[in-house]
């Protein structure tokens, strides 16, 4: 009875019961669907589409559609969806997040809602974290969709414009979050409708949703062009800052991730630079460079935050340990790090278009996600994205043992204990996966294991290419694998090893070549006797190894440091105990670890000191684990507050972006061009009358001469009017007279050029000016945001001030757009029609050659003499790179 009451009170348990009723319906249909021939089964797609056309809902056909996908998967892939996978599919269709543990088959789960929603013909996007997974899943799961008559597209780095357009027209499109976001930005820089690649954003399923929507939430996608600033000052400050003394000339706050120069430090820098006052208005650029150089030297650590590879500074993802190619820190920080490391400095950039993942994914009509760890961030998913989290039960009971944390006084003592633990388990043959938080720590541990003669594999950002292969074999007998954080997500660790990987490797050694596509799909190209014999041999070997590994307790996970997010720790633990396998996990910590040092080691340190505990003597108690988790919760809450605060500022910019992009799209497709221009002319006339003949001022004091000069310059060139012609008119009469004259001039211009040419001129001019003004507005808003925090000292709410001033700046930008459009419309000289073929070729090229505080994902910078990324066919310096009279 008590259990019943507990379940009744448990929201998640109630959800599972609701889902089970739908699963029962699907299971009842299984015999009927299984009896169908291939032709009849494949014909169900047309039947479903016909029923939808007649008004039936997706929910109405869900049980049958899911039963069809389950049977198609069984026939094509040899994989039948478990009941819990059906539950996950229902949750995804409902636009929620399904939390499913590692190894529960999330990739297969997605086929159910993807097929169902693709039947509408509006497109479904499946979003993965990297190109490898996008390729693998589109090839692997694509077999099911193609069997059922759906088309499958793939969006990865390096595709040209036509390939992208074709992929987006498919029923199902796989790709990475970066590519989807950049394509959205590029579509909003297009100059012709046929340059658009994306359709309306309908339905997206985000794999590893926590990684993309939370870890990367504040990361802006940026398309940028080169600015004209010199890089000399970065080298200057890279020489100055190392001569400053920590805690004397500057103070570092690791918890807040800030560094502040002291008055002593300011005096030293002024002397070295030979300036009288560093904070004089003329020296603003110097203070900016000093601040970035201090951050680069005091906060950013090589082999933790970034690596230097092939003469480039490459950011390391703090959550996955992967190298983030193409991503750069903004605001000059990346250049400061390049100067610190003595590599070539890339020029600073100017933002052409930008959006955050938070704002991009909120534009989808329906959004869903799946991950192994979402429950800890349930509040954030709900508040920011409106997404509920449903925890799906495992197919088999979870029998993994999570051992209490052990904590040491020093980091050295901790790593000595980790090595002893690895050695003991390795001696028995039990496979061990060790998680570290940085490349530096993984290589230090690797060195200690080498000294002990323990064979092992290292998987970190430096060895990214081998990732899937190393992770797949981490469950072999006696295997020791060191992995930076969560590298290798998306690849299952099979106890005993993966026979297909082993067979392919052996084939390579024998000189055979495996086809890339077949390899991605998990089926090698070599289907001859040699491959089959090898596969059979390795299957027997891995089955025997699996039996022995299970007897030894399965894969053992060792965490060498607690991450500030419990979710990341849970992801590491989740690498073992898949599908009911045995496994165990334990975290080793020290009082010198970042989390313990910054967030709550005082109590534990006090206990250890009072007890006189030696540095090699650990404390192991459930209370310690709870204390660490309490520290993690404090950090998580702080990070959530930061993300929520940032989003409040982003929302201001997002509303402006949506309005500009919506109006830009109407111009692009040629909607109401003439009406828009005539309305702009009327607005410009009204604004001019308000300026030169303001209300409440006596007519004798009106500046009619200035009004006519303004009209000549803007909306009535060559008018031949004098102030006497306007004398005696009221404000309303002035406005009506000037509007009528300017519209007559517009009509004459249209008659001279022809209506079709006039529409094309209007479209191109409006697009160019909107893009140019929007680019400047982005920079201005960025600068406003940088300094707005200081308003708090004047007892003003910075967010309210930002909204108010941002709105004023936006209105000024709109007025400036209207003025420039009207001015250019009356003055443009037509030499020859714009050749769309040329601009289309430029668009294809820009797709083929793809570029905070938070690191920004950038496309490669646009050089001054490169084709402009807007697709105009002009050089960047002659187009979006500067204001241009068309």
From Swiss-Prot:
Q: How is the cofactor bound?
A: May bind 1 zinc ion per subunit.
**EC category:** translocase
Gene Ontology terms: biological process: intracellular protein transmembrane transport; protein import; protein targeting; protein transport by the Sec complex
Q: Which residues bind ATP?
A: 85, 103-107, 492
Q: Which InterPro entries match?
A: Helicase_ATP-bd, P-loop_NTPase, SEC_C_motif, SecA, SecA_CS, SecA_DEAD, SecA_motor_DEAD, SecA_preprotein_X-link_dom
Question: Which Gene Ontology molecular function entries are recorded, alphabetically?
Answer: ATP binding; metal ion binding; protein-exporting ATPase activity
Q: Name one Pfam family in it.
A: P-loop_SecA
Which coenzyme or cofactor does it need?
Answer: Zn(2+)
Region described as Disordered: 841-866
Binding-site list for Zn(2+):
868, 870, 879-880
- Stretches of Basic and acidic residues bias are at 841-864
Record note on quaternary structure: Monomer and homodimer. Part of the essential Sec protein translocation apparatus which comprises SecA, SecYEG and auxiliary proteins SecDF. Other proteins may also be involved.
**What is the recorded name of this protein?**
Protein translocase subunit SecA
């Amino acid at each position: 009875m008590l259990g019943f009451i507990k379940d009744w009170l448990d929201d998640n348990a109630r959800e599972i019961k609701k889902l089970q009723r739908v699963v029962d319906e699907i299971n009842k249909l299984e015999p009927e669907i299984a009896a169908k021939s291939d032709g009849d089964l494949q014909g169900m797609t047309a039947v479903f589409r016909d029923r939808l056309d007649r008004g039936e809902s997706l929910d109405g056909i869900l049980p049958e559609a899911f039963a069809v996908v389950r049977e198609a998967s069984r026939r094509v892939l040899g994989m039948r969806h478990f009941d819990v996978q059906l539950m996950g599919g229902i949750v995804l269709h409902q636009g929620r997040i399904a939390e499913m543990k590692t190894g529960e088959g999330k990739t297969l789960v997605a086929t159910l809602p993807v097929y169902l929603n693709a039947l509408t013909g509006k497109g479904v996007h499946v979003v993965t974290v990297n190109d490898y997974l996008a390729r693998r899943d589109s090839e692997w799961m694509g077999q099911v969709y193609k069997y059922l008559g759906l088309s499958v597209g793939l969006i990865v780095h390096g595709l040209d414009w036509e390939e992208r357009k074709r992929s987006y027209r498919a029923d199902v499109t796989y790709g990475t979050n970066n590519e989807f976001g950049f394509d959205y930005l590029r579509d909003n820089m297009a100059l012709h409708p046929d340059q658009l690649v994306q359709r309306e954003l309908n339905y997206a399923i985000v794999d590893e949703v926590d990684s993309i929507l939370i870890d990367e939430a504040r990361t802006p996608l940026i398309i940028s062009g080169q600015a004209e600033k010199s890089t000399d000052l970065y080298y200057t400050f890279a020489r100055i800052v190392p001569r400053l003394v920590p805690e004397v000339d500057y103070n570092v706050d690791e918890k807040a991730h800030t560094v502040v120069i002291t008055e002593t430090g300011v005096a030293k820098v002024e002397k070295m630079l030979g300036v009288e006052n560093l904070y004089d208005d003329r020296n603003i650029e110097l203070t900016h460079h000093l601040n970035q150089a201090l951050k680069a030297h005091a906060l950013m650590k090589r082999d933790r935050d970034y690596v230097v590879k092939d003469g480039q500074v490459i950011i390391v993802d703090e959550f996955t340990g992967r190298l983030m190619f193409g991503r750069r820190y903004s605001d000059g920080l990346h250049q400061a790090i390049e100067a610190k490391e003595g590599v070539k400095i890339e020029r600073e950039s100017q933002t052409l278009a930008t959006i955050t993942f938070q704002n991009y994914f909120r534009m989808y009509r329906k959004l869903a996600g799946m991950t192994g760890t979402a429950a800890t961030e349930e509040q954030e998913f709900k508040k920011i994205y409106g997404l509920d989290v449903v925890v799906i039960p495992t197919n088999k009971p979870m029998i993994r043992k999570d051992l209490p944390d052990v904590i040491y006084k020093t980091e050295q003592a901790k790593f000595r204990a980790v090595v002893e633990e690895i050695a003991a388990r390795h001696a028995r043959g039990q496979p061990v996966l060790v998680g570290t938080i940085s490349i530096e720590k993984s290589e230090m541990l690797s060195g200690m294991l080498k000294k002990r003669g323990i064979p092992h594999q290292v998987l970190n950002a430096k060895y990214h290419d081998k990732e899937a292969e190393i992770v797949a074999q981490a469950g072999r007998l006696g295997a020791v694998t060191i992995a930076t954080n969560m590298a290798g997500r998306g690849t299952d660790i099979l106890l005993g090893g993966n026979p297909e990987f082993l067979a392919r490797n052996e084939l390579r050694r024998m000189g055979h070549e495996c086809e890339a596509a077949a390899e991605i799909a998990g089926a090698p190209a070599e289907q001859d006797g040699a491959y089959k014999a090898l596969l059979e041999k390795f299957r027997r070997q891995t089955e025997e190894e699996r039996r022995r590994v299970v007897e030894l307790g399965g894969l053992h996970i060792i965490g060498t440091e607690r991450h500030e997010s419990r979710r990341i720790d849970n992801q590491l633990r989740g690498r073992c105990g898949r599908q009911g396998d045995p496994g165990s996990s334990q975290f080793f910590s020290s009082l010198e670890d970042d989390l313990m040092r910054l967030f709550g080691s005082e109590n534990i340190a006090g206990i250890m000191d009072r007890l006189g505990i030696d540095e090699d003597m650990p404390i192991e108690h459930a209370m310690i684990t709870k204390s660490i988790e309490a520290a993690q919760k404090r950090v998580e809450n702080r990070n959530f507050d930061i993300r929520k605060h940032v989003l409040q500022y982003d929302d201001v910019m997002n509303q402006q972006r949506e309005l500009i992009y919506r109006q830009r799209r109407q111009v692009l497709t040629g909607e109401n061009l003439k009406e828009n221009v005539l309305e702009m002319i009327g607005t410009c006339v009204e604004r001019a009358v308000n300026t030169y003949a303001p209300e409440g001022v006596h007519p004798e004091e009106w500046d009619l001469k200035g009004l006519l000069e303004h009209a000549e310059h803007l909306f009535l060139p060559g008018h031949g009017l004098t102030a006497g012609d306007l004398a005696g008119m009221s404000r309303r009469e002035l406005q009506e007279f000037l509007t009528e004259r300017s519209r007559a001039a517009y009509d004459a211009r249209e008659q001279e050029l022809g209506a079709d040419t006039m529409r094309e001129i209007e479209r191109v001019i409006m697009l160019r000016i909107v893009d140019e003004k929007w680019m400047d507005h982005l920079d201005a808003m960025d600068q406003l945001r940088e300094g707005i925090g200081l308003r708090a000292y004047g007892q003003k709410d910075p967010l309210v001030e930002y909204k108010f001033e941002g709105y004023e700046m936006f209105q000024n930008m709109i007025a400036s757009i209207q003025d420039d459009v009207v001015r250019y419309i009356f003055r443009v000289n037509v030499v020859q029609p714009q050749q769309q073929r040329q601009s289309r070729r430029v668009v294809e090229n820009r797709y083929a050659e793809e570029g905070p505080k938070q690191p920004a994902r950038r496309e490669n910078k646009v050089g001054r003499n490169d084709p402009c990324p807007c697709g105009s066919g002009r050089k960047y310096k002659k187009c979006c790179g500067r204001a241009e009279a068309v």
